[in-house]
Swiss-Prot record:
It is an enzyme of class 5 (isomerase). Gene3D superfamilies: Phosphoglycerate mutase-like. HAMAP family: PGAM_GpmA (MF_01039). Homodimer. Disulfide bonds: none annotated. Pathway: Carbohydrate degradation; glycolysis; pyruvate from D-glyceraldehyde 3-phosphate: step 3/5. The gene is gpmA. This is 2,3-bisphosphoglycerate-dependent phosphoglycerate mutase. It comes from the Bacteria. GO terms for biological process: gluconeogenesis; glycolytic process. InterPro entries: His_Pase_superF_clade-1, His_PPase_superfam, PG/BPGM_mutase_AS, Phosphogly_mut1.
Length: 249
C-alpha cells in the first residue's frame, strides 16, 4: 500500500507578481494567489484526496494558501503543524530586489546560479538589517545561531530534513496522507531528497505556484511515482515561467 504526499507551493505572492526575491520576508498573496490556492484545493478534491494532517511554514503566503486549499477541499478541520524549518530559502541581501534588475546588474548566469544552484549562497543580509529574523518575534524561541543570514539550497535541505525525519516521515510511516504547503525552495529541497536528484539536475527543477505535486511512496518512503495534478502542459508552462524570472529583458 502506497503512502500519499502532496507538495503545494503557495499561490502567487505580491512579490512574485513584482518579480522580487522574497525569502523570509513575510509577504501576502495576491488575489490571483488566493485563486490558485482555491483551484489547488479543487484539483485535490477531484483526485479524491483525503488528508490526515497538513504542514506549513511560519510565513503567511504558505499559511493562507493552505487555508484556502483546505476550504476548497472541505477539510478545514485538519490538524495543521507549522514550522520555521519549512520556510523559504533565505535569500540574504537579495531579498526585496527585482530579479530582472539584478540580472541586468550581475548577469543572468550569476542570478541563475544564486536562484537555482545547489550549494552556492547569495550575499548575506547585514546583522543590523531591520528584516533580520532575530528581530522577528515568531523566531524568538530559537537559538540565534540557527537563524540564517543567507542560504543555498543545500543549507535549506539541511534545515528542512530534521523536520521531515522527526515530524513528516513518521506520519507517512503511520499510513497518514500528508499535505505540505510551503515554498519554491523548501519544496525543491524535499523534491531533491525524495527523488535523489543530483546537484546538477536540481538546477533545472522549477516548482510552479499553486499546482499540487502528488507523490506516491512505498512503505519505505521511496518514490513510486509523482505527478502534478490537473493539466500537465499547464504545469510545464508554469514551471518554465518560474525559470525565466531571473532573465534580463
Amino acid at each position: 500500500m502506497t503512502r500519499k504526499l502532496v507538495l503545494l507551493r503557495h499561490g502567487q505572492s505580491q512579490w512574485n507578481s513584482m518579480n522580487r526575491f522574497t525569502g523570509w520576508v513575510d509577504i501576502g498573496l495576491t488575489e490571483q494567489g488566493h485563486q490558485e490556492a482555491t483551484m489547488a484545493g479543487h484539483l485535490m478534491k477531484k483526485e479524491g484526496l483525503e488528508f490526515d494532517v497538513a504542514h506549513t511554514s511560519l510565513l503567511k503566503r504558505a499559511i493562507h494558501t493552505l487555508q484556502d486549499a483546505l476550504k476548497a477541499l472541505d477539510q478545514d478541520w485538519l490538524p495543521i503543524y507549522k514550522s520555521w524549518r519549512l520556510n523559504e530559502r533565505h535569500y540574504g541581501a537579495l531579498q526585496g530586489l527585482d530579479k530582472i534588475d539584478t540580472a541586468a546588474k550581475h548577469g543572468e548566469e550569476q542570478v541563475n546560479i544564486w536562484r537555482r544552484s545547489y550549494d552556492i549562497q547569495p550575499p548575506p543580509i547585514d546583522l543590523d538589517d531591520p528584516s533580520h529574523p532575530m528581530r522577528d518575534r515568531r523566531y524568538a524561541a530559537l537559538d540565534r545561531k540557527v537563524l540564517p543570514v543567507r542560504e543555498s539550497l543545500k543549507n535549506t535541505l539541511e534545515r528542512v530534513l530534521p523536520y521531515w525525519n522527526d515530524a513528516i516521515a513518521p506520519q507517512l510511516n503511520d499510513n497518514k496522507t500528508v499535505l505540505i504547503s510551503a515554498h519554491g525552495n523548501s519544496l525543491r529541497a524535499l523534491y531533491k531528497y525524495l527523488n535523489k536528484e543530483s546537484d546538477e539536475k536540481i538546477l533545472n527543477v522549477n516548482i510552479p505556484t499553486g499546482i499540487p505535486l502528488l507523490f506516491e511512496l512505498s512503505d519505505t518512503l521511496q518514490v513510486v511515482s509523482y505527478r502534478y495534478l490537473g493539466d500537465p502542459d499547464a504545469a510545464q508552462r508554469a514551471a518554465e515561467m518560474v525559470a525565466n524570472q531571473g532573465k534580463a529583458k
